[in-house]
């Protein structure tokens, strides 16, 4: 890994992939075709892009039961424990409707309502992610969403990854479709003969999925446009190089565009970590992916002081931040921008990916400066409630009418005055 002495001025805000003109046109064509031809278009795209001809798009209950039965019993118990932790954490995020009554009899409040239906896209490719099923489905269930739909591209044999199906079965999700890519997003947004539309779409995917989510946004809601995974480790001379290297590689192995950065005031630690990364790379199964990520988006930044290192971390605003210093929680108040913060050497990033309970769907590309990770809030909507009393309207009606006329809206003013029997 390259080592660089710095004094601020760094950024994770890489160029956001907007796709080529050809890719954008392809996505628009796919969406239009799915809207026009429904299931027939989905099956054609599945045969073309995934190499499998399907008679039915929907995963059967029997397929889910087989996948669940084939799962190792110990692994199933781990999934159950992780699910319990995730559910316990997210229950604390749930908001209830509330009311307040003022002295004049006015009642004001907020009604919190779960979304009716949500869709979760689970990507295929080089790895299967049952953890993504847990992290997206559980907060939806805690919020009270009644209909949860999963779509995922099928394997060449027409099946979905057993881990994904087993996790969904454990959570009681039964509406799952063998559809991937932009065509899946189109189906979730607009519906087909088999797939009823949803209100909001969640989950990461490739550039075609990202472009499709952008295109359907407004007709339905979306969670975010997820970028490649990121980790920043803030460490001092007390940290262990082998642990830091392992954590950097844990993100680098995700994707060739993943980012892994160490920020430290210790050149000795920087050199040791760089050496340890090379040593650990030798035996990593996904070595080629991790190495490409480190070459393109990996770095070790050396600052003059720990205080400067904290400033650099806040500028980076990473998806994942690990703090491995002599007194990690002493920095809690100064650290402002990160999707998730992991304090201390035993809080390795994969703890949050799989088991601790907080959500692993987090803002990337420096957007942790202004956005948050996935939560129960993403699965509800809030409506203002106003029950104005006659006393209150008589007391404030003239003010409301005056405000309306200030903006040139006479009908607004008259709507108030007719109730005060002052209409002209």
Curated annotation (Swiss-Prot):
Positions contributing to Zn(2+) binding: 251, 254, 353, 412
Family that this chain belongs to: Belongs to the histidinol dehydrogenase family.
Catalytic activity: L-histidinol + 2 NAD(+) + H2O = L-histidine + 2 NADH + 3 H(+)
Cofactor remark from the record: Binds 1 zinc ion per subunit.
Gene giving rise to this polypeptide: hisD
Organism this protein belongs to: Geobacillus kaustophilus (strain HTA426)
GO MF, one example: zinc ion binding
Name by which UniProt lists this protein: Histidinol dehydrogenase
Alphabetical list of Gene3D superfamilies matching this protein: 1.20.5.1300, Nitrogenase molybdenum iron protein domain
């Amino acid at each position: 890994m390259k080592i660089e002495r710095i004094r601020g001025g760094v950024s994770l805000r890489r160029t956001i992939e907007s796709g080529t003109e050809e890719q954008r046109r392809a996505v628009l064509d796919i969406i239009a075709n799915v809207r026009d031809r429904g299931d027939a278009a989905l099956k054609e795209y599945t045969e073309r892009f995934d190499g499998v001809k399907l008679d039915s798009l929907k995963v059967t209950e029997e397929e889910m039961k087989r996948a669940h039965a084939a799962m190792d019993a110990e692994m199933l118990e781990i999934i159950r424990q992780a699910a319990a932790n995730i559910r316990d954490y997210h229950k604390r995020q749930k908001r209830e409707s509330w009311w307040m009554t003022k002295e004049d009899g006015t009642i004001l409040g907020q009604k919190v309502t779960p979304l009716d239906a949500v869709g979760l896209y689970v990507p295929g490719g080089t790895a299967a992610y049952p953890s993504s099923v847990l992290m997206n489905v559980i907060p939806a269930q805690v919020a009270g969403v009644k209909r949860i739909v999963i779509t995922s591209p099928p394997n060449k044999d027409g099946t979905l990854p057993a881990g994904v199906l087993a996790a969904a079965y454990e959570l009681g999700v039964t509406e799952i479709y063998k559809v991937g890519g932009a065509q899946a997003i189109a189906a979730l947004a607009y519906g087909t003969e088999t797939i009823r539309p949803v209100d909001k779409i969640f989950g990461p995917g490739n550039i075609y999925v990202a472009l499709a989510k952008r295109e359907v946004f407004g007709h339905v809601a979306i969670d975010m446009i997820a970028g490649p995974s990121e980790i920043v480790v803030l460490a001092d001379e007390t940290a262990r190089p082998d642990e830091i290297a392992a954590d950097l590689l844990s993100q680098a192995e995700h994707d060739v565009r993943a980012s892994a950065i160490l920020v430290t005031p210790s050149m000795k630690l920087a050199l040791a970590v760089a050496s340890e990364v090379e040593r650990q790379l030798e035996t990593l199964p996904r070595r080629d992916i991790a190495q490409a990520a480190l070459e393109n988006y990996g770095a070790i930044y050396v600052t003059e002081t720990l205080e400067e290192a904290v400033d650099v971390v806040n500028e980076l605003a990473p998806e994942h931040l690990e703090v491995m210093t002599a007194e990690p929680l002493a920095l809690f108040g100064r650290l402002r921008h990160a999707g998730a913060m992991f304090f201390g050497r035993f809080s390795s990033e994969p703890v949050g990916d799989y088991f601790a309970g907080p959500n692993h769907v987090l803002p990337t590309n420096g957007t942790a400066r202004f956005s948050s990770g996935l939560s129960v809030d993403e699965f509800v909507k809030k409506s203002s409630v106003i029950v104005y009393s006659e006393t209150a309207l008589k007391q404030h009606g003239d003010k409301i009418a005056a405000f309306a006329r200030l903006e040139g809206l006479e009908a607004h003013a008259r709507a108030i005055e007719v109730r005060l029997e002052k209409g002209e």
